[in-house]
Amino acid sequence: MQEFQSIPGLAGRLFGGAAAADIRRAQAQQGPASRCGGIPSPEAVKCPRCESTNTKFCYYNNYNLSQPRHFCKSCRRYWTKGGVLRNVPVGGGCRKTKRSGSSSAASSAPSTPTAATDNAKNQRRASASSPRSSSGGSGNTSPTAAAATTPTTPATPSSNTIAVINHATTTTTTTNPFPTDVPPPAPIFADQAAALASLFAPPPPPPLPVFSFAAQAKTEDGIASVLLAGQTTAPTAATVADMTPFTSLDAGIFELGDVPPAAYWNAGSCWTDVPDPNVYLP
């Protein structure tokens, strides 16, 4: 390990010696500002208006060190060294504006049609409630008199109220930029729907002929009837010609004659070609 060795002639001068004592003495003379870093505190600048020292430094005007700008917290004003003093306080919260009599009268009068209509409604309510109060007061004395004095006709508003309401309605109708009868919106896909309907629609019927074919149709019907008649007569003649040999044959071979059926079948004449009469033929 490294060992510290004392230097002859400097013992007690570096740490805790005469040098340390000199440093403490100098700091005590300069004050607490020197202990914090050696920067002296700025001198308090007096306000040129109120001579108050409650001021602070703001900045240098145009970065010029000869024109510092300060602010006075007492009179709330700025000033620049070498400049002109202006009597303009900072912030307008301290000043109070005075209201004129015309503005107060305008504020008290109804300025909008809605306020006029509200006043008219209040007047009508007051006029409607006055007969009720009178009838209620008389009801304390006699119930029958109260029932007899019940108002039968509603209170009618005054002419001034009607004029105010008409004026409000006219102003609202004239100043309304949006019409009340708005047409319904058109469908967005109207063209596409029409195109799809035209694609899937059935084909149109064929056009009607220019000339009429009523007489030609009748002629065709007559020709068809003639052809059918010829076809029906021709097969009948051929059939008769073909059946001529069969008609010329003797009909007795297909008939039993006068012999009863039982005697004919039991006589054995029809079984002469059978060699063994004991054989049963189905």
Curated annotation (Swiss-Prot):
Kindly list the positions annotated as binding Zn(2+).
C47, C50, C72, C75
Q: Can you provide one Gene Ontology molecular function annotated for this UniProt record? A: DNA binding
* Entry-linked InterPro entries: Dof, Znf_Dof
The cross-references to PROSITE patterns, in alphabetical order and at most eight, read: ZF_DOF_1, ZF_DOF_2
Q: Where is this region: Disordered?
A: 89-161
- Zinc finger (Dof-type) stretch: 45-99
Q: Where in the cell is it found?
A: Nucleus
Please verify whether the record's keywords include Transcription: yes
Query: Organism's domain of life?
Result: Eukaryota
**Inducing stimuli:** Induced by gibberellin.
Q: What is this protein called?
A: Dof zinc finger protein 4
Keywords recorded for this protein, A-Z: DNA-binding, Metal-binding, Nucleus, Transcription, Transcription regulation, Zinc, Zinc-finger
Q: One Pfam family, short name please?
A: Zn_ribbon_Dof
- List the GO terms this entry assigns under cellular component, sorted alphabetically: nucleus
Known role: Transcription factor that may transactivate seed storage protein genes in developing seeds.
Q: Please list the residue ranges that the record marks as compositionally biased, kind Low complexity.
A: 102-117, 125-161
